[in-house]
Amino acid sequence: MADTANYINDRFQTFMNGLGDRYEPYVREHLSKVYMVLGSTAAATAMGAMLQMRDFLDLGVLAAVATLVLVLGLHFYKDDGKNYYTRLGMLYAFGFCSGQTLGPLLGYICSINPAIILSALTGTFVTFISLSLSALLAEQGKYLYLGGMLVSVINTMALLSLFNMVFKSYFVQVTQLYVGVFVMAAFIVYDTQNIVEKCRNGNRDVVQHALDLFFDVLSMFRRLLIILTQKEERKQNERRQNKTK
């Protein structure tokens, strides 16, 4: 056990030294702030979802409207060096309202199998950590070319969504879910390297950079929830059919 602990500690120190050699101190400091704000926003999201599920506070449609207003506000209310805490509060409010909108889905999933939520949460967390580390340890700027490609895929998916509102194709719906997971995974890699490049070019907007990553994480989590729920529903339907035979 001692040898294993020493090995893990040595590998961790090697990793930290590698980051120290690869990134300037101000970049490492900026990334630390971004990830701390991202974690706090995720906590606000969890709080909003829990309050909605427990019927302590349910903003309903107001939460959806608030998320739109807040994200537009963050986009147009640019960082000027003096409004950090105002924008940070807006980000936390956005996270909280996002949790409120997520609450009904989580409540439905709990009625089917609560373990789905933990599975989706674990999958999202492990994927985010793995891809973030991959982006940070990869060659600098290696994945920035993905930006244009990902925007094209997102636009195509949006058109397919409009198409599917009319034709109600189950195949299109499922394809969008699975493709969406891979697209969000690619966005995590792209946004991580893009944040580093922006920081080096003088853009130290912690709130906006945390928002970019939060979008990626939340979108992936939603899709994993739906995919796992659909699989569980199929299993339960098959079990019911087998019992009736």
Curated annotation (Swiss-Prot):
The record's CDD domains line, in alphabetical order, gives: BI-1
Q: How does it sit in the membrane?
A: Multi-pass membrane protein
Q: Which residues lie on this side of the membrane: Cytoplasmic?
A: 1-30, 77-88, 137-142, 191-245
Effect of a null allele: RNAi-mediated knockdown induces autophagy in larvae under basal and fasting conditions with larvae showing an increased number of autophagosomes. Decreased larval survival following treatment with tunicamycin. Impaired pupal salivary gland degradation with pupae undergoing autophagy prematurely by six hours after puparium formation. Increased adult survival during nutrient starvation.
Q: Does the keyword Oxidoreductase apply?
A: no
Q: Where in the cell is it found?
A: Endoplasmic reticulum membrane
Name a single GO biological process.
Answer: cellular response to starvation
The cross-references to InterPro entries, in alphabetical order and at most eight, read: Bax_inhbtr1_CS (IPR006213), Bax_inhibitor_1-related (IPR006214)
So what family is this one in?
A: Belongs to the BI1 family.
Its function, per the record, reads: Suppressor of apoptosis. Modulates unfolded protein response signaling. Negatively regulates autophagy and autophagosome formation, especially during periods of nutrient deprivation, and reduces cell survival during starvation.
What's the protein here called? Bax inhibitor 1
Organism the protein comes from: Drosophila melanogaster
Give the taxonomic lineage as stored in the record. Answer: Eukaryota, Metazoa, Ecdysozoa, Arthropoda, Hexapoda
Q: Which gene encodes it?
A: BI-1
